A protein has these predicted regions:
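Short conserved micro-motifs at the rims of enzyme active sites and ligand-binding pockets
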Residues: 181-183, 219-223, 272-273
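Accessory alpha/beta interaction modules
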Residues: 1-206
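Extended serine/threonine-enriched, polar tracts that run as long, contiguous segments within proteins
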Residues: 196-229
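Charged, alpha-helix-enriched surfaces in structured cytosolic catalytic cores
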Residues: 69, 73, 131, 226, ...
Length: 340
């Protein structure tokens, strides 16, 4: 496997060479030894080409898709996702009102302004949030409100609602929530608001959800046939055979891998970035487990509440039946007295 990728990327280093550098420098050795065996193997594998690089790690994604230095890459990706021509004008600060727990569950979150004034937010989640619809709707509304405040402050008295442009929330899931698995053959979900009467109004918010786990399952043993499939393969695959298939069929992706393998030449930097990814991954996992446990507790509390209500209703029914029996017993006693 190593030789196959090295044929395409000669800068890929040998395992012995990399380990020798790590052992010679106390700082690097300390970082390396702080990882468990699985993480050490993962690091060595992607640095030496045994596996491809995991593009979805935040540091790696931002290195290869940085809209400030190489905007054309993110532009090309957005063209495929939005299915329209895209030109990035500037990167916007992500000053949304997300709560801290939500921020910690994200891999990547980039907001850009497009040439027509619309906003696109690319959000990558390693583990899909619960309630993806409600969360997306709230964040989409927040994006729209932020744009409204910014434009109104800039335009002043000349402000017009016509100056408010579309906002696109693009959510890419490495592991998608259960709602998306109700559609096991679909890995592109697009939503915009419409009226059932046929009234045509642009409500400005559009949502796109891309479950990469479903894409990988769907593409198993299949050939990449479209640029969109090529992008999703780039984001989701670290299998060397898939990487080679991708760059042979779509050579425009090769420079992106070269960017990352060049980054791997700086061992100290890439080790520090990888360590930060691992820390974030651990936090993500803890947050996810807490959220799942809370959902289970809420569900159990709801069941207990329903059972209590049912028992209360049964107690009331028994009490009413007891009253009826007492009343019938009195009536029978009265009848006996009349007969006697």
């Amino acid at each position: 496997m190593t030789n196959k990728l090295k044929n395409y990327f000669p800068m890929i280093r040998q395992k012995d060479e990399l380990l020798e550098e790590i052992k010679k420098q106390p700082k690097l050795r300390a970082i390396y030894e702080s990882w468990d065996l699985e993480r050490r193997e993962e690091f060595l594998n992607f640095c030496t080409g045994v596996r491809g690089i995991k593009i979805l790690y935040d540091s790696f994604f931002k290195e290869v898709m940085n809209p400030e230095y190489v905007p054309e890459r993110l532009e090309n990706f957005l063209c495929e996702v939005l299915r329209r021509k895209v030109k990035i004008v500037r990167i916007l600060p992500n000053d949304s009102t997300r709560i801290a727990d939500e921020v910690s569950l994200l891999i990547t979150d980039i907001v850009v302004e497009l040439e027509d004034g619309s906003l696109a937010n690319v959000e990558i989640q390693k583990i899909g949030y619960s309630f993806p619809g409600a969360r997306s709707a709230c964040y989409g509304a927040d994006m729209l409100l932020r744009q409204y405040k910014r434009v109104r402050a800039k335009q002043g008295e000349s402000f017009s609602y016509n100056d408010i442009k579309n906002v696109f929330l693009i959510v890419i899931y490495e592991k998608s929530p259960k709602e998306l698995h109700q559609f096991p053959d679909i890995y592109y979900h697009h939503s915009r608001q419409t009226f059932d009467s046929g009234l045509k109004l642009d409500m400005l918010q559009e949502f796109i959800m891309i479950p990469l786990d479903i894409f990988r399952s769907k593409m198993h043993n299949k050939t990449i046939k479209t640029v969109f499939e090529a992008w999703l393969t780039f984001l989701s695959e670290d299998d060397p055979e898939k990487v080679i298939q991708l760059i042979e069929r779509y050579p425009e992706f090769k420079p992106m891998y070269e960017t990352l393998y060049q980054m791997c030449q700086n061992t100290e930097r890439v080790m520090e970035l990888f360590s930060e990814e691992l820390r974030q991954l651990d936090r993500n996992t803890v947050k996810y487990m807490i959220e799942q446990q809370q959902q289970e507790l809420d569900k159990q509390a709801e069941i207990i509440g329903q059972q209590k209500q049912e028992l209360s209703q049964k107690d009331e029914q028994l009490s009413q039946m007891e009253e009826r029996l007492k009343k019938q017993a009195k009536e029978m006693e009265e009848l006996r007295r009349q007969l006697g």
